[in-house]
Amino acid sequence: MTASCWTICLFLLGSVTEFIVLASPEVNESQQQHPQNVYHDIGVTRNKIVTAQFECYQKIMKDNSQDRRGPVCNRTWDGWLCWDDTEAGITSEQHCPDYFQDFDPTEMVTKICTESGQWFLHPESNRTWTNFTRCNLHTTEGRRTAMNLFYLALIGHGLSLTSLFISLGIFFHFKSLSCQRITLHKNLFFSFVLNSIITIIWLTAVANNQELVQQNPISCKISQFIHLYIFGCNYFWMLCEGIYLHTLIVVAVFAEKQHLMWYYLLGWGFPLIPATIHAVARSYYYNDNCWISSNTSLLYIIHGPICAAMLVNLFFLLNIVRVLITKLKVTHQAKSSLYMKAVRATLILVPLLGIQYVLLPYKPSGRVSAEIYDYIMHILMHYQGLLVATIFCFFNGEVQAVLRRHWNQYRIQFGSTITQSDALRSASYTASSITEVQGCYSIDGHTEHLNGKNYHDFDNAIIKPENPFA
């Protein structure tokens, strides 16, 4: 595909995605015409509390209470949370509920069972009391952290877009870089460009718009579908890079030409399958909040194939390294050394892009440690485009050699142009001075000598310096 085709596709997809996300007039008009939508939050919270209360009373009735020994505080529902039987003198605790936006689920709620086997009574109200004060103790800090993470993501995708566009410009401009491996690089970069654009639109137009998320219109679900599809394309194009190198080095033994159609089907076509299955499943289960909620195992439909692709890719790359090391020991071929450099970049990149899935299940429960974890995960997730462009383009030896060669040519041309213009000015000044002298003294023979061959030789000697780098 030419650069103009890539540009047109990028413009159309970005415009369509932004239109899908932003063009939801039915939501805004319904909010203006129906004031009860303002209380949508209250309705959702009430439903959560009623559901939790129903489950608590079922649990209270089913649990066996015959094996109690000593004074025990009875199981109870305090209005928000369910508490099991607790021994006297013990402080029971559990995580804060997610009923309200300013509640931090990582913080803990406590309820004291006194030595007498009664739940603690608040001295002012003389009623049983549960300590929820820590749930919104760090609300301001949490909001500040959320905004920092939001801007960190935007900056990351902005830097990624800048570096990716520069890299694509280099690949398209310098025809000497054109080969099948660079074509795969272009598709990989283009998938990361689309991912950054759609993520920026998603963060600013959907995730940052709570009213839109609660209304759950079809437009934001479509944008989430596109987002997850492009997200999968990133990793399957990385798999294409690994398969290409494996076929080139291990299977086809340095054969340069391969059929790229299969790579296009794998990189752009296959991610449609898990994205479609996920969309159908979410439409039947967890069909809420624009499909943003992550408390569902349905996300394994997306993450499972991605993890499988990365494991297969890692296996291919390790096998390639094994083959290349063997070839280098036996033959010491320069070509094997060059391929080793190409493999090294991919081998470094695959773990860096996949480490987030290793860390994903291990989010710490503490507030500070969870905040550090969020910062690390945001850097790993939202700066991937910058990382890919840096390793595959800016650190690429071929790209550096081409840029260095063109820079030296530019310096030579620019330097020779300056030297030539200075020489022409000097020759013109010399010729005009001689002409003036000839006019004053009327020495015709000398004039003919200067305007003849000897003069042109002098001119050429001035224009063509011995040192071409001067």
Curated annotation (Swiss-Prot):
Respond yes or no to whether keyword Repeat is given for this record: no
What UniProt keywords are attached to this protein's entry?
A: Cell membrane, Disulfide bond, G-protein coupled receptor, Glycoprotein, Membrane, Receptor, Signal, Transducer, Transmembrane, Transmembrane helix
Per the UniProt entry, the signal peptide is 1-23
Instruction: Report the Pfam families cross-referenced here.
Output: 7tm_2, HRM
Please name the CDD domains in this protein's record.
Answer: 7tmB1_calcitonin_R
Q: Which SMART domains match?
A: HormR
Protein's cellular compartments: Cell membrane
Gene3D superfamilies in alphabetical order = GPCR, family 2, extracellular hormone receptor domain (4.10.1240.10), Rhodopsin 7-helix transmembrane proteins (1.20.1070.10)
Which cysteines does the record link by disulfide bonds?
56-82, 73-113, 96-135
- Identify its protein family: Belongs to the G-protein coupled receptor 2 family.
Name of the protein in question: Calcitonin gene-related peptide type 1 receptor
Q: Which organism is it from?
A: Danio rerio (Zebrafish)
| Gene giving rise to this polypeptide | calcrla
